[in-house]
C-alpha cells in the first residue's frame, strides 16, 4: 500500500533519530524493497554518532565487503570524543548526585536559585551549562537516549527560557523520551514545548508556524501511544486555531491522523459533535489532501453514499495496517466506522432490513444481527429487532430545543473560526519566505 504511505512526507518534519522506528516498521511490512530501506538507514546514520549501528546496516547491505576505513576511523574518533566529554562532565554530574541538590531540584522552580545554590556549595560555573548541553547532545547522537534525557533535564531546570540552547534542549528531551517510549514523560515534555512555542514573542510568525508544524508531527508518537492521546490530539489539531492553521497551510496530510482520532474516540457524545466540525475541515481541504480515511468521512457525512463508504472502509483497513502510527487503531476504527454507517443509515430510514444492513456493513446477516443486539444491550442504540420479519425498528430520538440551540451556537463559533483562519492562511501564503535555518538541520535535536 505504498500509494498511501506518508513516511516520506512525515520524515521531512522529524529529527533523523525519530525516522528510524518508521523505517523499521516499513521493513517489517515489506512495503518497499529491503535494500532501498537499508540505503535509507545508512544515509540517516551518516550524520549521527551511532557508528556500530551504521556498521551493522553496512554488513546487511554489503555482506561480501569489508567495513569502510572511514567508518572505522569515525568510530575511533567518536569513542575518543565521548571519553573526553565524560571526563569534563563527571564532576558536574557528581554535583547533581548530592542529596541536598536533589531536594533543591524537586522543591524549587526557580532555576536561578538552584544555580546559586550549586555555585555556593559546589563551585558551579556558567560554562558548566554548555558542557552539560554538549554532553547531552553527544549522548543523543550516539543513541544513548536515557543519558541524553537525564542531562537535558539537569540543563533545563538550570537555564532561563532566554538561553540560546533552551528551546533546542526541549526538543531533545522530547525526542529522547519518545525514543525510550516513556509516554507520560513525553506528554509532559510535549506540553512544555508547546507552551514555550506559543508564548515565544521573539520568533517571527513564519518561525512560529514552522515550530508548530514540527510539533504536530512529533506529537503523533505521543498521541497514538498515550492513554489520553486521542482526546488531546483532537483538542490541539482541531480546536486550537494556530495548529489547525499550520495543518491547513503546511501539512494537510495530518488530517488522516486527526480523522482517525475522532473516529476511534471512546466518548460517544464528544465524537458526534466533533465529527460535524471535522467534516467541515475535510471538505475545505479535500482539494489539497485526501485518502481512504478522509474520503470515508466525506462519503458518509457529505454525500450520504453508503456504497462508497463501505468501499472506502475496506481500503481504510489497508491504510491503517500499513501506517506506523495507526496500526494499533485498526479494531477500534472498523468497529466505530461500522457504527457510523449504521447510525447515518438509521437517521434516513425508520425501519431497516437486517440483510440490507449486513450488506452495508460488510457482514453476514447473522453477524449483523448479533452486532445490533450488542449495541442495544449496551445502551448505545435505541431500537428493537423484529426477528420474524428480519427488521430493525428505530426508536424516536428527539433532540431538545435547548440542545439544538447549543449545537447551532457551536456551529456558528466554528464557522467564524474557520473564516478567520482562511484570512490568516491567505496572508501567510502571500508573505511566506524560506523556513528558518534550524528546520533544515536534521541531526541532533533539531
Swiss-Prot record:
One of its GO terms (molecular function) is translation initiation factor activity. The keyword Nucleus applies. Residues 222-399 form the PCI domain. InterPro entries: eIF3e (IPR016650), eIF3e_N (IPR019010), PCI_dom (IPR000717), WH_DNA-bd_sf (IPR036390). It comes from the Eukaryota. It is found in: Cytoplasm; Nucleus. Component of the eukaryotic translation initiation factor 3 (eIF-3) complex, which is composed of 13 subunits: eif3a, eif3b, eif3c, eif3d, eif3e, eif3f, eif3g, eif3h, eif3i, eif3j, eif3k, eif3l and eif3m. Component of the eukaryotic translation initiation factor 3 (eIF-3) complex, which is involved in protein synthesis of a specialized repertoire of mRNAs and, together with other initiation factors, stimulates binding of mRNA and methionyl-tRNAi to the 40S ribosome. The eIF-3 complex specifically targets and initiates translation of a subset of mRNAs involved in cell proliferation. This is Eukaryotic translation initiation factor 3 subunit E-A.
Amino acid at each position: 500500500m505504498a500509494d498511501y504511505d506518508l513516511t516520506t512526507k512525515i520524515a521531512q518534519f522529524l529529527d533523523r533519530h525519530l525516522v528510524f522506528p518508521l523505517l523499521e516498521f516499513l521493513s517489517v511490512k515489506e512495503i518497499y524493497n529491503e535494500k532501498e530501506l537499508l540505503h535509507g538507514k545508512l544515509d540517516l546514520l551518516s550524520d549521527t554518532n551511532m557508528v556500530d549501528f551504521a556498521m551493522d546496516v553496512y554488513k546487511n547491505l554489503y555482506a561480501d565487503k569489508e567495513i569502510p576505513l572511514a567508518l572505522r576511523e569515525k568510530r575511533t574518533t567518536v569513542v575518543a570524543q565521548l571519553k573526553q566529554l565524560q571526563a569534563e562532565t563527571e564532576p558536574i554530574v557528581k554535583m547533581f548526585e548530592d542529596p541536598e541538590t536533589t531536594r533543591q531540584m524537586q522543591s524549587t522552580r526557580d532555576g536561578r536559585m538552584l544555580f546559586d545554590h550549586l555555585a555556593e556549595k559546589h563551585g558551579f560555573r556558567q560554562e558548566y551549562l554548555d558542557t552539560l548541553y554538549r554532553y547531552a547532545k553527544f549522548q543523543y547522537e550516539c543513541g544513548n537516549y536515557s543519558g541524553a534525557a537525564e542531562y537535558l533535564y539537569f540543563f533545563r531546570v538550570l537555564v532561563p527560557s532566554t538561553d540560546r540552547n533552551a528551546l533546542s534542549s526541549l526538543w531533545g528531551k522530547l525526542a529522547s523520551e519518545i525514543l525510550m517510549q516513556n509516554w507520560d514523560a513525553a506528554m509532559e515534555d510535549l506540553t512544555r514545548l508547546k507552551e514555550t512555542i506559543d508564548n515565544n514573542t521573539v520568533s517571527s510568525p513564519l518561525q512560529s508556524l514552522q515550530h508548530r508544524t514540527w510539533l504536530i508531527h512529533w506529537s503523533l508518537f505521543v498521541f497514538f501511544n498515550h492513554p489520553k492521546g486521542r482526546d488531546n490530539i483532537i483538542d490541539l489539531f482541531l480546536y486550537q486555531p494556530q495548529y489547525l492553521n499550520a495543518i491547513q497551510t503546511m501539512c494537510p496530510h495530518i488530517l488522516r491522523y486527526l480523522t482517525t482520532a475522532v473516529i476511534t474516540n471512546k466518548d460517544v457524545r464528544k465524537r458526534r459533535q466533533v465529527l460535524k466540525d471535522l467534516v467541515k475541515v475535510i471538505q475545505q481541504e479535500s482539494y489539497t489532501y485526501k485518502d481512504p480515511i478522509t474520503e470515508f468521512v466525506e462519503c458518509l457525512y457529505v454525500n450520504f453514499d453508503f456504497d462508497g463508504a463501505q468501499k472506502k472502509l475496506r481500503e481504510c483497513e489497508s491504510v491503517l495496517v500499513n501506517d506506523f502510527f495507526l496500526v494499533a487503531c485498526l479494531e477500534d476504527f472498523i468497529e466505530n466506522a461500522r457504527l457510523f454507517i449504521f447510525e447515518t443509515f438509521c437517521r434516513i430510514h425508520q425501519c431497516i432490513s437486517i440483510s440490507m444492513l449486513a450488506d452495508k456493513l460488510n457482514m453476514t446477516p447473522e453477524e449483523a444481527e448479533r452486532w445490533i443486539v450488542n449495541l442495544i444491550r449496551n445502551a448505545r442504540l435505541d431500537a428493537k429487532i423484529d426477528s420474524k420479519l428480519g427488521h430493525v425498528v428505530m426508536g424516536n430520538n428527539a433532540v431538545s430545543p435547548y440542545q439544538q440551540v447549543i449545537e447551532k451556537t457551536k456551529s456558528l463559533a466554528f464557522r467564524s473560526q474557520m473564516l478567520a483562519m482562511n484570512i490568516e492562511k491567505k496572508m501567510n501564503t502571500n508573505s511566506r519566505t524560506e523556513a528558518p535555518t534550524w528546520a533544515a538541520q536534521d541531526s541532533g535535536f533539531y
